[in-house]
Amino acid sequence: MNLLNLFNPLQTAGMEEEFDAIKIGIASPETIRSWSYGEVKKPETINYRTFKPERDGLFCAKIFGPVKDYECLCGKYKRLKFKGVTCEKCGVEVTLSKVRRERMGHIELAAPVAHIWFLKSLPSRLGMVLDMTLRDIERVLYFEAFVVTDPGMTPLQRRQLLTEDDYYNKLDEYGDDFDAKMGAEGIRELLRTLNVAGEIEILRQELESTGSDTKIKKIAKRLKVLEAFHRSGMKLEWMIMDVLPVLPPDLRPLVPLDGGRFATSDLNDLYRRVINRNNRLKRLLELHAPDIIVRNEKRMLQEAVDSLLDNGRRGKAMTGANKRPLKSLADMIKGKGGRFRQNLLGKRVDYSGRSVITVGPYLRLHQCGLPKKMALELFKPFIFHKLEKQGLASTVKAAKKLVEQEVPEVWDILEEVIREHPIMLNRAPTLHRLGIQAFEPILIEGKAIQLHPLVCAAFNADFDGDQMAVHVPLSLEAQMEARTLMLASNNVLSPANGEPIIVPSQDIVLGLYYMTRDRINAKGEGSLFADVKEVHRAYHTKQVELGTKITVRLREWVKNEAGEFEPVVNRYETTVGRALLSEILPKGLPFEYVNKALKKKEISKLINASFRLCGLRDTVIFADHLMYTGFGFAAKGGISIAVDDMEIPKEKAALLAEANAEVKEIEDQYRQGLVTNGERYNKVVDIWGRAGDKIAKAMMDNLSKQKVIDRDGNEVDQESFNSIYMMADSGARGSAAQIKQLSGMRGLMAKPDGSIIETPITSNFREGLTVLQYFIATHGARKGLADTALKTANSGYLTRRLVDVTQDLVVVEDDCGTSDGFVMKAVVQGGDVIEALRDRILGRVTASDVVDPSSGETLVEAGTLLTEKLVDMIDQSGVDEVKVRTPITCKTRHGLCAHCYGRDLARGKLVNAGEAVGVIAAQSIGEPGTQLTMRTFHIGGAASRAAAASQVEAKSNGTARFSSQMRYVANNKGELVVIGRSCEVVIHDDIGRERERHKVPYGAILLVQDGMAIKAGQTLATWDPHTRPMITEHAGMVKFENVEEGVTVAKQTDDVTGLSTLVVIDGKRRSSSASKLLRPTVKLLDENGVEICIPGTSTPVSMAFPVGAVITVREGQEIGKGDVLARIPQASSKTRDITGGLPRVAELFEARVPKDAGMLAEITGTVSFGKETKGKQRLIVTDVDGVAYETLISKEKQILVHDGQVVNRGETIVDGAVDPHDILRLQGIEALARYIVQEVQEVYRLQGVKISDKHIEVIIRQMLRRVNIADAGETGFITGEQVERGDVMAANEKALEEGKEPARYENVLLGITKASLSTDSFISAASFQETTRVLTEAAIMGKQDELRGLKENVIVGRLIPAGTGLTYHRSRHQQWQGVEQETAETQVTDE
């Protein structure tokens, strides 16, 4: 389909061309001439006196069409009746002037010119095709050298470069036997004579015969480009242009400004330069000017065309009169202000308005207040229609007048028009889909939009001057969709985690909390009431207070077997407030949900329970009532803040004095030289940190309780009614940390570089700060503000990349039928269950049957959606792990299936076909991005304390189990010594559920055994945190090798104890060169003095001591299994900065290789060390068959294994951050997914943000969508190329059907940016980043965009293939297939 017709406005609606794909390619000179309506010969634009376009110029009316509708230039033919006539005087065709937006011209170039994109867009495509370097091609193109195009019978090589002197010498030598050319002619000649098919054959043979990796890569790249040309039928020489298309003049307008000047598009300037130089060159060629002059002119022409296509890509950018680089064609389409992102993906829309928002506390959830003035403007066409229909106006003009005069009838009509016509409200930035919701408008006076308080959380709106935009859905379908899908009352749950997002906050929470708190000995305590009405009367006649404890008979509604509600009457001990609140409970919600002091969390649970038990409609009504009630009681409660509410604890002075004394003691120790400066600093920071916590605790204990006299006259404690405490406790506003600053002490502050200042601020805000304290505090405050600004931009960019990588992922079918999935367990860290199994599997589909561990019967069959009921049952039966389906293993080719995705979190049932789950996942991960921190944490003070733990204790009763990687030996004392690297002790409860999971380091001593029953608080294992031991797994007599005092080891004597030890010296520091290569090792001998071998092999046991190891055994000493040979001191708090927050999330999704990455074992086998090289150690792993795998590791890295140790494939052998690519390669997709999900979740968890694992898995699916072909088999792929997973699967299926050999492939992990750019859709990739590179590549490949994703369809202006658009696309597809079948059938019948 011709692209020009895609945007052709002259085609009538009936002629709308249907298209299914867009193809991009390189235009041949013939194509360019066929687009053109004439050649532009002159650089002139318009005549400055008559303002008419010059003939044959850049705005020529003859070529591009008339300037005025239906009027030729000289004015001979005017009006519609001459339509289609061409004026014989001025040559202009009489037609609409808007053809000037689409008619193109052309320039015939006097010399061919290379297209800069194919030359300079890296990797250079011209260079690839010709197998020449970019530098060489440039020298030819810009007339610095000749290139041999046809060597003839001479010894010259084709494509050889000759300088000018060389050329003339060779000319003298060989005469006309050879051909050499300069400039684009030379390159074009080379391209024209290149035999593509022959070259492909040669390359394929080379590919099979060569062994070197770099060569294979190089050949594969070249092969790919040549095959693309071969396939698409484009000619190589089209990359060199003979003819240049000229953009239609209305797309590069010339606008007269007042004062006789013109504002012009930069393109006109650029075209003018090209035409000038081209005409000059033509003249020079006619005059047969000297070579050197012609060459210079040709070079200038090449540069002018380069600037027109992509200014600044080569050399200096061309500048206009004001020294600013001119905007070229490439700049028009790329970047944020380019065509893609500015005009195609983000358009401004009519029927919209914006205004400030204020609170509408009396609204219902689905309503919003719309100012009358705004509504009148937005709904104008509807009002005109109604006015005409009711006969109040005869024409549109009359109707317009009525509306402008604002006659009373207009307001009545406006009311009618607006009724049941939803409008959409949007608050920028729209970070997730709840940033746009539909409401029914209520007309209000004033100029501000009124917003329902409960939807503020979704919009992230507050009323400090926020503005919102209003949009009107016009068509009936649009109104329907807005009402059913976007109405605020239909969006109660958050798509990110499936929890209610319509949750009361702030005042409402405070009001409800105040209403449901109980008071001891309040008026009327202990009264009995027959029903709620009686409580009402008592409360209004002031017989009882809100917090009075009473007993009341309540009627509740319970579902019976038939599913109908039956009343049940119960007596409850409760308070007056709670009894009053019970009135608004929906049917079927038990009273116990509100029979407690309602804090924010409880209210959230209440709404969630209401949604699950009573359904959407009742929940919305309930939420509204909660809001009205909450506001009412917040007003009646009159809770406010006074200075007296900030009670400073009496213990503060004593605690400060104690801390000061401790600090003084440390300072004294430092002066005596007992501790280093670093230790002193850490300890001081620690002391103040603890002091701050103690004061805060004292303050909270003091605030949270107050003494009262009960009915019997005794003094008792009750929860405090202190206003500040109530605000924090209810979750309405503020937190313990903030109260600490108000009435405790402010605590430690950080310097701008993130290090902690060791003198804390001991005052609080109530006491006031001194000048110095205030100054210290300003650092942090300012850094916070600067951080926020950066954070917003970074977070937005992350969201954009995430959306781009997942935008084409839509649920397209119900079930792909796979039984693959991942095994889900509870997330346990240290001793705590962070996320229970039930929360992880809720809303997923089982991949295999869930079996009861005790009875062995099937609880849930495979393929079942796990609802709340089912997960509760699984939870109670003690199932430890469940295999569930996941998007990562879904077999659907373009998109996902509903069963692999599971429940639609925002609707609470299985996801519908057409749901754009990719975009939802991206929004859910990106939206909280602004809440994440930006900083990298320096481990100091508190954190290093945690790092130096020396034991683990059980936190609950249960049974100890060792993880599968656990390896240990028993030493002579009978202690179990851990000799594995990734060992864990897991604690199970009585029914076998995992409760805790503790990591146990290498060298720890286990104090429990597998399967042993343990009590809470029991120590499981102990170890020395400051040294890392080296442990023998064999018994025998010690024999040292290369352990020479003063050469490889040094004797160190402890001053205090007088004991001496041997310490291994670093090879670099040793004196003689021979001793540098010596490695001190230990071997073991048996009683006969023979070397002991590793069991089952003939390799002797030999363990090398690492540098810095303190040797703890003596020559000839008898040692047993599990004994310590040496200890390696650990640098106690080596501050490795942890990347946290947003940068960490970005790092994970971009799949970056970490800075000092650790290393995993490539194979299972035995470790040994080879010969060291300079600064590197050689680590060798030998497997059972004796195959060795060796790697070089730099000396600075900490190797976690030692000689003779057995490691499993994928086990960590060198300390450092884990590289996700390694995990994928060595442990597989499931391990990788688990790693990324866990790491991402950890960042969000720290900020208290809940996101469903599902969303992260959707992103991971997209990161894994490409594979590397390891062996192409007989599928036609090229070995080493990256292709879509689905394409390989399809090709392999086909190959197997035909009995051919399928391709073997390896999984590849791509970062989200790379994955976005490597998508099949070039339109999507080009509109994302690196537009030039993407389009160049697509053009050469002759790519076809199937318009599968959402982005591509938005760009070409169609409905997106998601949601209601999916059905439209499907029905169109079926029609197409039907048409194709019909045509096929008719052909058959004709024959």
Swiss-Prot record:
Zn(2+) 1 binds at residues 72, 74, 87, 90. InterPro entries: DNA-dir_RpoC_beta_prime (IPR045867), DNA-dir_RpoC_beta_prime_bact (IPR012754), RNA_pol_asu (IPR000722), RNA_pol_N (IPR006592), RNA_pol_Rpb1_1 (IPR007080), RNA_pol_Rpb1_3 (IPR007066), RNA_pol_Rpb1_3_sf (IPR042102), RNA_pol_Rpb1_4 (IPR007083). Its cofactor is Mg(2+); Zn(2+). Zn(2+) 2 binds at residues 816, 890, 897, 900. The keyword tRNA processing does not apply. It comes from the Bacteria. Mg(2+) binds at residues 462, 464, 466. One of its GO terms (molecular function) is DNA binding. GO terms for biological process: DNA-templated transcription. SMART domains: RPOLA_N. Belongs to the RNA polymerase beta' chain family. The RNAP catalytic core consists of 2 alpha, 1 beta, 1 beta' and 1 omega subunit. When a sigma factor is associated with the core the holoenzyme is formed, which can initiate transcription. This is DNA-directed RNA polymerase subunit beta'. It comes from Neisseria meningitidis serogroup A / serotype 4A (strain DSM 15465 / Z2491).
